Amino acid sequence: MNFKLLSLLLAGLATAGPIEQRQTSSSGNELRDGPCQPVTFIFARASTEQGLLGGSTGPAVCNDLKSARNQEVACQGVGPKYQATLAANSLPAGTSDEAIEEAKGLFEQAASKCPDTQIVAGGYSQGTAVMHGAIPKLSDAIKDQIKGVVLFGDTRNQQDNEQIPDFPKDKTKIYCAVGDQVCHGSLIVAAPHFSYVADAGDASRFLVEKLD
């Protein structure tokens, strides 16, 4: 698929909508800038979404986790090296090496700065590729510290056999809407790819149930 066609197909991420905007008090930089919390949520947003957490599923899950855990959750988005550009979707890993390494570094920072925190994570669209790339690179000890991962509109779903490589399948929940071809190895973006904020509540409950 040439880049011009890819850009046209993915332009829906920038123009379709409106995506429901969820208000959050989180800066999306709470691991880096704040104190350790009992739970740390690391999230990679979709292409073209603004802010470290994006404007849809990321803030929604962050809010739900904070509500469920008495606000004792640090929400951290992947960025600024992860720029969530459209072009990065066409790379072999579905995102940039810089994004994957940045996410890996955030997991490592959570484990080293806050050794007692329980880590949960998520990604939406290109952000799922960030998680698919970063988590397998982590040490076994950090993988054990990750309690659960939720992926919305998983761009690596087919390529990685409906799982994150080298990570327990029972710790992962993948949301693929009916008609979302992105989950089947395509870069064609259609309306179902923008429906995942409706799954945020279920995803948050999945993560909460994985916590001690």
Curated annotation (Swiss-Prot):
Primary location class: secreted
Give yes or no: UniProt keyword Disulfide bond.
Answer: yes
Pfam families from the UniProt entry: Cutinase (PF01083)
Recorded hits in SMART domains, A to Z, give:
Cutinase
Q: For this UniProt entry, which residues form the secretion signal?
A: 1-16
Q: Which Gene3D superfamilies match?
A: alpha/beta hydrolase
| Localization annotation | Secreted
Question: Which UniProt keyword terms apply here?
Answer: Disulfide bond, Hydrolase, Secreted, Serine esterase, Signal
Q: Kindly list the cysteine pairs connected by disulfide bridges.
A: 36-114, 62-75, 176-183
Q: Which GO molecular function annotations are given, in alphabetical order?
A: cutinase activity
Any single GO CC term annotated in Swiss-Prot or TrEMBL for this entry: extracellular region
EC number(s) given by UniProt: 3.1.1.74
**Reactions accelerated catalytically:** cutin + H2O = cutin monomers
Q: Which InterPro entries match?
A: AB_hydrolase_fold (IPR029058), Cutinase/axe (IPR000675), CUTINASE_1 (IPR043580), CUTINASE_2 (IPR043579), Cutinase_monf (IPR011150)
Could you say which residues are annotated as the site Transition state stabilizer? Answer: 47, 126
Q: Which residues form the active site?
A: 125, 180, 193
Q: Which GO terms describe its biological process?
A: antibiotic biosynthetic process; carbohydrate catabolic process; monocarboxylic acid biosynthetic process
- Main role? Catalyzes the hydrolysis of complex carboxylic polyesters found in the cell wall of plants. Degrades cutin, a macromolecule that forms the structure of the plant cuticle.
Family membership, please give it: Belongs to the cutinase family.
Protein name (database record): Probable cutinase 2
